[in-house]
């Protein structure tokens, strides 16, 4: 009797296909309980994606937790003997906080782990199975590969202090070239060192194009060993028709990954559906001398494959369309003028239409006209491929996007302002009025000052005048509004300008179109600057 799986949801079909794939590869199913001792997560919290865990006291008095992670439990219980390689796959739910809903989410995962003796053969098998997993999901896919050993080797060669490494890797991960250079300078690197880090941004593309440049940039044995492993992986997967891409800015968490790292994307989905890498450091906490590599497939992301298609789809005769989230207002007008001047204009009069979607299929461009504060949301969730947004909005939203270019447009700064006669009283918390709650919290936490936040949505300057707050945190451009209301700038702590951002998944499939637009936009901005 044959069972028709076509009636199942995409994630249900995927689970059948992946189970067959993993069992054929010699993996045994690992099943764990829903609860785990909280102490396991408390002692290993640096290996978790978030320290927030759902806990409860069991009937016998033990403090238990709903599992936020599967790999940690497998690493604890596997206990491979010397020379042995254990191969497990799993299909479990984990419970993690959502930055969007500010609640805990139940997340369906399916994945595999190879533990114990992990050499070149096991690494190649794990990455090959990751690629095969993506191929089972029924959409065009990309597997993005990098190596933490290569990144650590470069940081070693440049003499980067341990305390500065996490910040540099975060800027690399976001492809934020402008702030990477600033962070490199803050870490004590000279111009040559900063350029060496910036050069990683260029090590991105098809394996056969990028690997020679990866090898040429090696400075020590650690980098050469990583490059050799990447070469072996490329040879193993050479039949993937360009679906394997190297990207040396892909950096996993320092405390977790120590070797190969990779992420998988499906066309039309806004986030990675697969994440994995080598995590010997975690494994060796439980079994000294052992290694481990594995990955997880995020099945819940596949629910989007059964969602209705948006009304603006590519026609068969069209160029690949770049969907641009453009902020309404002065900034959007400036940006559109620049883009129209370099070949990305639309036949319709941008300023006259009341349409929210304007496009030019011949130029491969489509604009969504949105509220400035919503640009990052449209891009992060994949409704738009790229967008232009102020650094203030981007920071406040903590959007998980690539920050590809500082346009230099709309320059201003984030400031603390107060009445002219204001004196700070360290004996009590500062009352802060702002619409930038997260930015204000982060700034005052960095200087160790307690605050009470008063969230307002407009006319922020009125708050200290009426005694509602002691100070405000707000954007200042010329300072005229502050002066006319008897306020002064106390501290400037964040420069702001408009940034060109991209959805991480869209970048994998439309990077040529994005790079072409970026190159033209940089040239237009440079020409504009020269005219000043």
Task: Give residue spans per PLM region.
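A generic structural motif
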Residues: 60-62, 114-120, 506
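Short, conserved phosphate-binding/catalytic loop or strand-edge motifs used
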Residues: 106-110, 146-153
